[in-house]
Amino acid sequence: MSYRFHHMMKVCAEQAFAALPEQTRRAYHGRYGAWYAAHGQYLHALAAYRKGEDYDAVLQVIQDDAGILLAALSPEEVLAFLDACPRDTLQAHPLTLLVLMRRMFTWQQIPKMLELRALLLAGIEAHPELPDAERDNLLGECDLIMSFLQYNDIAAMSRLHRSAAARMTRPAISIRNEGSWTFGSPSVLMMFHRTPGQLGAELDAMNACMPHYYRLTNGHGQGAEQIMDAEAALLQGRFADAAIFLECARATIAGNGQENMALCCDFLERRLALCVDTAAPEPPAHKRAALLAQHDTMWLRIFDSACAYCAALTGQTEQIPALFRDHALHTVHLLAPCRPMMEMIENQVYLAEGACARVIGRSEGLLAQCAQQHYALVALQVRIQTSAAYAALGKRPEARSLLGQALRAAAPDGLLLPFAENGRGLRPLLELSLIHI
């Protein structure tokens, strides 16, 4: 009954507000937006300013938040705002343009990203009075953002990072170290293992390039190279090395507030604990409760994906978090770079549930995504999963063919763990497949 009265009062208040003069409504929306922004509630601030059509205020909030919470909105909402926002207003906010360029990349809205870059460069060109230092900072930060178009070619990205570092005299404004570095992926290695047979070179490149990136971004993603080293060691069966690299990464990121990188460590620790006798990881319920208190849905999804993967491997399907157990990934906003990883983990859940035909049916589209983003490790794992699914359905020729492809891709880098993790389903095939490599 109390809810009904509350709803009636809310409707009455909304009707009374709608009857106010337009200028008065805009003034109130501006006051709401200012209060929310002052208290760090940027999504509410954006909503209020948009209702009041205060485009300058919206753009300032996006800059203040560095676009972190834009991930909670749909691309369509943000694109509609950009279409409505006057060009001159956009051009007056060059730092916001940089933030928006990065967000367009994560949504794979590349034409819009390039359109915003052109607007930024035109704005810089139109203001010759701009101090040289600020001009160089804007152009350098533009190089930094454009490096994402070379994702996940580590060397190509690093060339643009070094170009940016040569220009910039301040840290980047458009990237905050509390924001997600992995775009929501639970694994660094899944993001950056690009070419079978080149894992060693990729690890060397990551160790060489990250210090330049850290200097530009106040340490955003700190520990990424150590996590990637640890993951590579884990997949190669070098468990002691994996544990050492993991603890080095944890020491690096301790106390720096980068929950994203800590969650990648957590995923690695949980996989390692399935292989060797180590201290038990923190119980999922405890960790999840701590994450809930942070009110960040991306962190929760990363953690849920790690728990779902490990529970699926061990057949503990009742322990799989609801997002994956209910196969509800399609209901949430995922950034494009992390989608193949999340879909691969959902595949592992389907396999644990015995939905083998579903795994096979999904594999072609998922492998196409992996090819588009050069995700060699995710593709390897999808082929292994699909091979196990074919084997479970008695389709041995198809299973052996896919397993052979996976073994040929994994052998040059000595990647063993993905096969071991699916050992129950692959064991009858492995001996025959090894003969035919």
Predicted regions: what they are:
Residues 1-32, 55-56:
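Short capping/hinge segments at domain boundaries that bridge a core fold to an adjacent linker or tail
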Residues 39, 52, 72, 107, ...:
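Structural motif corresponding to the intra-repeat A-B loop/turn of tetratricopeptide repeats
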Residues 42-46, 54-55, 93, 130-140, ...:
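Alpha-solenoid helical repeat architecture
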Residues 78-84, 111-122, 156-169, 199-212, ...:
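Alpha-helical repeat scaffolds
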Residues 88-264:
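Internal alpha-solenoid helical repeat scaffolds
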Residues 435-437:
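Conserved small/polar residues in nucleotide/adenosyl-binding loops
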